[in-house]
């Protein structure tokens, strides 16, 4: 069972949650002064239209025609499936649906914001976009977006993933991007971390620092971010806006689930539904899933912190483990991040979104069952949502409830097979920090 929307039903506007949040978003702080960040400084880092969108209180923002045309070319609208074989295997009365972002040409949801960011950069005359990537999904998406828009792309990829997932960098190079393992010897911050540990596995926080340092050296370059900030999450709401239309062919969901690193794929599916709950039109339950190795939602502190490891970004008020936290080299590279989207942090604080955390071995076990029943190999990140959906379906079985579960399968794992090989060979290790910098006041 699946629902596929015609191109004519593709969303024409993104949904911006800022005017509907239960409290105002705290302003970003200048890392040099700890005062609210002036927009002029943000304009040196980001494309100007993205800075405008980041601050906008407009509830809906038009998707440019060029971006919508490219959305159609890369696979939007994406299909929504019912996981009937998984339901049978679990012997649950629950009905499980998933939005499949792996159907895009790059294999994940990341292309949704990559095309938008590259479009606005090209319109401004920017010549190069520089970014970070964890597992490589975001780097792949921006590399293609740059190729389609005629903009050069440079990617700093977390070193652990650079070697765990070698074919990701092959695809990025095929699309014309430059790619470097992070930490690298190309930046001052990269050399600092390499001097401390020549085999440093890196992480999103370090890669972000390197990308921003790189951008600040080149007036014709700007930074593109794959998650966390509001404009990125807003671009992803095409997922949830499509899903709302598709679920009309089936039934209304009771619970909505997504994995979380910075928060973009969760927000993409959930935020259009969150609006209905905030408006009092529905009583949806929202579950955000993270790895126990990077538990920013379940164990982090809500405070101002840097978005990167080197302290170059504005400080944001968010759930954080502390920007100095060393995230272990789990295979879900896209979830190896110390912080969290500020908008999602607020929703968690108000009890609208409930976070849960899992070890990677139990996540891969859930992914194996999903692959055997539904035929799709989930990305390790997306497999966290699979695990939560399975647990929820088993709970419904215990309680005899015919619950309707919707989750975001944000990408496929066909280029993440080293993690699956390690899982099948019994080589996966679970990580859970005993101490966290944020709990010691180190932010």
Swiss-Prot record:
Keyword set includes Lyase: yes
Pathway assignment: Amino-acid biosynthesis; L-tryptophan biosynthesis; L-tryptophan from chorismate: step 5/5
Modified residues (N6-(pyridoxal phosphate)lysine): 110
GO molecular function, one term: L-serine hydro-lyase (adding indole, L-tryptophan-forming) activity
Gene Ontology CC, one term: cytoplasm
CDD domains per the UniProt record, alphabetical: Trp-synth_B
Pfam families from the UniProt entry: PALP
Gene3D superfamilies from the UniProt entry: 3.40.50.1100
InterPro entries: Trp_synth_b-like, Trp_synth_b_CS, Trp_synth_beta, Trp_synth_beta/beta-like, TrpB-like_PALP, TrpB-like_PALP_sf
The reaction(s) this protein catalyses: (1S,2R)-1-C-(indol-3-yl)glycerol 3-phosphate + L-serine = D-glyceraldehyde 3-phosphate + L-tryptophan + H2O
EC number, UniProt record: 4.2.1.20
Xref: PROSITE patterns: TRP_SYNTHASE_BETA (PS00168)
Cofactor(s), names only, from the UniProt record: pyridoxal 5'-phosphate
Keywords, in A-Z order: Amino-acid biosynthesis, Aromatic amino acid biosynthesis, Lyase, Pyridoxal phosphate, Tryptophan biosynthesis
Catalytic EC class: lyase
Presence of the UniProt keyword Glycosyltransferase in the record: no
Subunit and interaction comment: Tetramer of two alpha and two beta chains.
Entry's family note: Belongs to the TrpB family.
PANTHER family: TRYPTOPHAN SYNTHASE, TRYPTOPHAN SYNTHASE-RELATED
Free-text function comment from the UniProt entry: The beta subunit is responsible for the synthesis of L-tryptophan from indole and L-serine.
NCBIfam families assigned: PRK12391.1, trpB_rel
Name used for this protein in its record: Tryptophan synthase beta chain
Species for this entry: Thermococcus onnurineus (strain NA1)
The organism's taxonomic lineage, starting at the top: Archaea, Methanobacteriati, Methanobacteriota, Thermococci, Thermococcales
């Amino acid at each position: 069972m699946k629902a596929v929307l015609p191109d004519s039903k593709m969303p024409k506007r993104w949904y911006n949650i800022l005017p509907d949040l239960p409290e105002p978003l705290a302003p970003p702080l200048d890392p040099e002064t700890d005062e609210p960040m002036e927009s002029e400084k943000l304009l040196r880092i980001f494309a100007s239209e993205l800075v405008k969108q980041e601050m906008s209180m407009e509830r809906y923002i038009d998707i440019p025609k060029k971006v919508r045309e490219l959305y159609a070319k890369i696979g939007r609208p994406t299909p929504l499936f019912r996981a009937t074989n998984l339901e049978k295997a679990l012997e649950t009365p629950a009905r499980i649906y998933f939005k499949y972002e792996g159907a895009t040409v790059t294999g994940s949801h990341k292309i949704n914001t990559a095309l938008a960011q590259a479009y606005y950069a090209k319109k401004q005359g920017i010549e190069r976009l520089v970014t970070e990537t964890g597992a490589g999904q975001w780097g792949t998406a921006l590399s293609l977006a740059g190729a389609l828009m005629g903009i050069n792309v440079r990617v700093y990829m977390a070193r652990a993933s650079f070697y765990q997932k070698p074919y990701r960098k092959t695809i990025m190079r095929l699309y014309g991007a430059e790619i470097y393992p992070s930490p690298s010897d190309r930046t001052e911050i990269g050399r600092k971390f390499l001097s401390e540990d020549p085999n440093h596995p890196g992480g999103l926080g370090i890669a972000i620092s390197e990308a921003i340092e790189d951008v600040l050296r080149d007036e014709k370059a700007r930074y593109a971010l794959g998650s966390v900030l509001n404009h990125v999450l807003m671009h992803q709401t095409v997922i949830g806006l499509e899903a709302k239309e598709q679920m009309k062919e089936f039934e209304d969901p009771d619970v909505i689930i997504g994995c979380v690193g910075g928060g973009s794929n969760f927000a993409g599916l959930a935020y259009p539904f969150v609006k209905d709950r905030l408006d009092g039109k529905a009583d949806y339950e929202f579950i955000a899933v993270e790895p126990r190795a990077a538990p920013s939602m379940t164990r982090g502190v809500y405070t101002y912190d840097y978005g990167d490891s080197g302290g170059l970004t504005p400080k944001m008020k968010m759930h954080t483990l502390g920007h100095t936290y060393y995230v272990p080299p789990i295979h879900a590279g896209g979830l190896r991040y110390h912080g969290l989207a500020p908008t999602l942090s607020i929703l968690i604080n108000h009890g609208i979104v409930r976070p849960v955390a899992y070890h990677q071995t139990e996540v891969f076990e859930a992914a194996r069952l999903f692959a055997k029943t539904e035929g799709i190999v989930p990305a390790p990140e997306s497999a966290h949502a699979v695990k939560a959906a399975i647990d929820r379906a088993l709970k419904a079985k215990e309680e005899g409830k015919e619950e309707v579960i919707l989750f975001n399968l944000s990408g496929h794992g066909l280029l993440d097979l080293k993690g699956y090989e390690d899982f099948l060979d019994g080589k996966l290790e679970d990580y859970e920090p005993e101490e966290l910098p944020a709990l010691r006041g180190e932010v």
